[in-house]
């Protein structure tokens, strides 16, 4: 309630301020600049304007185009007001520099893993597919609807016994009613249960048609050595994704590649090992320290 008074009184002793997400940061950045001499770091997580623009391109909803323009103005103001802006991948960095070349922005590792224990991929002990995503996020709802309506009918013809587990909190009625004997809507699962799904399913599927930024569900699957089938949106921000992930944007191509991968033991084992290696190479504490060192005087 009285945070501004506190900041005014103590601001001289604050060396760094780390702000997260545009709708939160916009409330504080002016006061931080007014009452402190702190180095301000802004972490945007993803580009809201880019995500909403892509949703507009998919749906044609004019309100999304206006919302995208509003977000772009707000996000750019925050980026330019900060001493440095962080984003989870090179994709956001490039997108920002295209519209604001003067912006100070860099990609940082979105996730950090101190110890990646590699488990052997046992093809014969794994079966079925999984999707994980919170349903308060519109792209996840769209992904499951596209999966159910455009992918599952053809996939079941190729793999009649296949099951796809839909995991994630608060599935709306429009998702619940998509359930079939092959598409199981499980809803919320604990971290322990989620890890069991990663260890028992052959493939994690991420059929996102829009969104922005590096996708946590993709990195998480790779962290557990579970091969991923996704779209170019799902693979966004992962350098060299084609050698680690299977990627298709059209439903027919998605089905063909997914069915082939599901039955290819050697390729699944290779992708599992490649996933572990990618995580070790790109999401270590040592790597993060090198990237953020200049801003926090860690060098």
Q: What is the predicted function of each stretch?
A:
Residues 80-86, 98-102, 106-200:
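Conserved catalytic-core segment of nucleotide-activated headgroup transferases in glycan assembly
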Residues 14-15, 83, 199-213, 224-226:
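Acidic donor-binding loop of glycosyltransferase active sites
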Residues 35-52:
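Active-site proximal beta-strand in glycosyltransferases
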Residues 263-296:
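A charged, aromatic-enriched C-terminal amphipathic alpha-helix characteristic of glycosyltransferases
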């Amino acid at each position: 309630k009285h945070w501004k008074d506190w900041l005014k009184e103590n601001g001289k002793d604050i060396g760094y301020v780390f702000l997260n997400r545009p709708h939160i940061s916009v409330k504080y950045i002016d006061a931080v600049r007014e009452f402190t001499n702190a180095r301000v770091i802004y972490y945007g997580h993803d580009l809201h304007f880019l995500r909403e623009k892509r949703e507009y391109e998919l749906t044609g909803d004019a309100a999304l185009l206006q919302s995208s323009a509003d977000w772009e103005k707000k996000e750019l103001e925050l980026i330019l007001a900060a001493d440095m802006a962080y984003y989870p991948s090179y994709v956001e960095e490039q997108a920002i520099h295209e519209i604001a070349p003067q912006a100070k922005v860099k990609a940082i590792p979105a996730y950090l893993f101190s110890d990646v224990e590699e488990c052997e991929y046992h093809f014969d002990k794994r079966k079925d597919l999984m999707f994980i995503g919170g349903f308060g996020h519109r792209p996840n709802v769209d992904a499951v609807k596209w999966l159910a309506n455009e992918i599952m009918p053809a996939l079941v013809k190729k793999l009649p016994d296949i099951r796809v587990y839909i995991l994630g909190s608060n599935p709306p009625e429009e998702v619940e009613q998509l359930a079939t004997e092959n598409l199981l809507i499980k809803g919320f699962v604990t971290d322990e249960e989620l890890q069991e799904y990663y260890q028992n399913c052959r493939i994690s599927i991420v059929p996102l048609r829009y969104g922005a930024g590096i996708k946590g569900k993709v990195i998480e699957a790779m962290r557990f050595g579970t091969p991923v089938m996704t779209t170019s949106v799902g693979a966004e921000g992962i350098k060299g994704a084609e050698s680690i992930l299977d990627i298709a944007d059209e439903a027919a191509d998605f089905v063909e590649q997914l069915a082939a991968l599901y039955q290819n033991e050697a390729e699944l084992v290779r992708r599992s090992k490649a996933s572990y290696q990618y995580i070790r190479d790109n999401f270590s504490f040592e790597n993060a320290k090198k990237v953020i060192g200049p801003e926090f005087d860690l060098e």
